Swiss-Prot record:
Gene name of the record: argH
InterPro entries: Arg_succ_lyase_C, Argininosuccinate_lyase, Fumarase/histidase_N, Fumarate_lyase_CS, Fumarate_lyase_fam, Fumarate_lyase_N, L-Aspartase-like
Family annotation (NCBIfam families): argH
Cell location: Cytoplasm
Organism: Acinetobacter baumannii (strain AYE)
Name used for this protein in its record: Argininosuccinate lyase
Primary location class: cytoplasm
Domain of life: Bacteria
Pfam families linked: ASL_C2, Lyase_1
Length: 477
């Protein structure tokens, strides 16, 4: 994500910074100024920085540190700066290091000495921690909206395929028949847990560090609860050292994002397999695919392939943040400037991947007959035959061996169990009678028999879809 404002001016002036010039006897090296600047990427949360400053100024006026006139000048100036940024006329300066000082400097240019009073009672340490939390909270809400859209798309597709039979797999080998709707509901369940994790993460993100100042708090009579209320935070941080120094909330988000991407990657892998000429289970519309520069016949599932690949970068973003934080003593350290890009990258990647999936899933077209034919291969009803014998008094292990021998015959004759004659089946057990074909060896009998909560029978899948819609209402209430 980039703002529409101008890129940072990389020319660092030959003077000490206005932020700390009194202490230093020589100018910051031009390369060091550029090397240590973060405005190239932290300008992304200018909205949150301005919102935090407006709330801070409002609170300072409430407690008497600023006059109402000073507060109004600051708010008007910040609102104008936001408009400049969004119009692309704001000049970002690298010598001002970050989003905070760029905005504060411009504010002072516009309203004079009152602009220099804005930073009273706060530090960039608690300011940036607040900005990140505000920004991440907004992004979590957007991502939750995309998750909801994808989940609804899955339920819609599942509802159309309650009776569509396909092979279920273990070890990527045919195992038992399931319905396509049931398979899609498995994806849905993964995303429900992802939603719950993200919502839980949001609770810890939504704590306000502002007021912690550099590390020990401030001597001014601030009203943190009032500022938190203005910014929509549920509570304030309890310890100033912790508030300015830890980024575990960002790590937690990246962990939740990694799990989302892991699930999307698994779904992508299945879609890639299913669209191959060897499976042909589903068709992805052309708008989500690309071709080959040399092979005219190719239709490549680039969207799921790219999402499968992008999962790795989000995992890397998580490890980057963990590694960044693991060796830091309290409180704030410059290391933490490196927290933003791994967080931003994870946010952007998850958002883009969910957008692509939310658009693509409802457009999938299953090849119903091909799925059914595939379920007829690989002896998918073998377990049902074993269960049939158990119900007639055979111990399960003995039934397992009997059916294994029947499968061996089927392999030798290149026939499914349902294609063997009754006489052939009875050579393995005289308990097998003509009803075996209707009760155990048809695909419909197999899926219908699994008629319990969590099972693949069409009746249960319909009930699960109904429950899922209610769960979504509760999740996103």
């Amino acid at each position: 994500m980039t703002t529409s404002s101008n890129p940072p001016n990389s020319a660092a002036p030959n003077q000490t910074s206005g932020m700390w010039g009194g202490r230093f006897s020589e100018a910051t090296d031009a390369f060091v100024a550029e090397f240590t600047a973060s405005v190239q990427f932290d300008q992304r949360f200018y909205k949150q920085d301005i919102a935090g400053s407006i709330a801070h100024a409002t609170m300072l006026a409430k407690v008497g540190v600023l006059t109402e006139a000073e507060r109004d000048d600051i708010i008007e100036g910040l609102s104008t700066i936001r408009a400049e940024i969004e119009a692309g006329t704001f000049e970002w300066r690298i010598d001002l290091e970050d989003v905070h000082m760029n905005i504060e400097s411009r504010l002072t240019q516009r309203i004079g000495i009152t602009g220099k009073k804005l930073h009273t009672g706060r530090s960039r340490n608690d300011q940036v921690a607040t900005d990140i939390r505000l920004y991440l909270r907004d992004e979590i809400d957007d991502i939750l909206g995309l998750l909801e859209r994808l989940q609804k798309g899955l339920l819609g597709l599942a509802a159309k395929n309650v009776n569509t039979i396909m092979p279920g797999f273990t070890h990527l080998q045919t195992a038992q028949p399931v319905t396509f709707g049931h398979h899609l509901l498995a994806w849905f369940e993964m995303l429900v847990r992802d939603t719950e994790r993200l919502q839980d993460c949001r609770k810890r993100v939504n704590r306000m560090p502002l007021g912690s100042a550099a590390l020990a708090g401030t001597t001014y009579p601030i009203d943190r609860a009032y500022t938190a209320e203005l910014l929509g935070f549920e509570a304030v941080s309890e310890n100033s050292l912790d508030a300015v120094s830890d980024r575990d909330f960002a790590i937690e988000f990246n962990a939740a994002a990694s799990l989302i991407m892991m699930h999307l990657s698994r779904m992508s892998e299945e879609l890639i397999l299913w669209t191959s000429a060897q499976f042909k289970f589903v068709n992805i519309p052309d708008r989500f695919c690309t071709g080959s520069s040399i092979m005219p016949q190719k239709k490549n599932p680039d969207v799921p392939e790219l999402i499968r690949g992008k999962s790795g970068r989000v995992f890397g973003d998580l490890v980057s943040l963990l590694t960044l934080m693991k060796g830091q003593p309290l409180a704030y350290n410059k290391d933490n400037q490196e927290d933003k890009e791994p967080l931003f990258d994870a946010i952007d990647t998850v958002r883009g991947s969910l957008m692509a999936f939310a658009d693509m899933i409802p457009a999938l077209v299953p090849n119903v007959e091909i799925m059914r034919e595939a379920a007829l291969r690989g002896f998918s009803t073998a377990t049902d035959l074993a269960d049939y014998l158990v119900k007639k008094g055979v111990a399960f292990r003995d039934a397992h061996e009997i059916v294994g021998k029947a499968v061996a015959l089927g392999v030798a004759e290149e026939k499914d169990l349902s294609e063997l004659t009754l006489e052939q089946l009875q050579q393995f057990s005289d308990l097998i009678t003509a009803d075996v074909f209707d009760k155990a060896l048809t695909l419909e009998a197999s899926v219908n028999a699994r008629d319990h909560i969590g099972g693949t029978s069409p009746k249960q899948v319909e009930a699960a879809i109904a429950r899922a819609h209610k769960r979504l209402e509760q999740l996103y209430a």
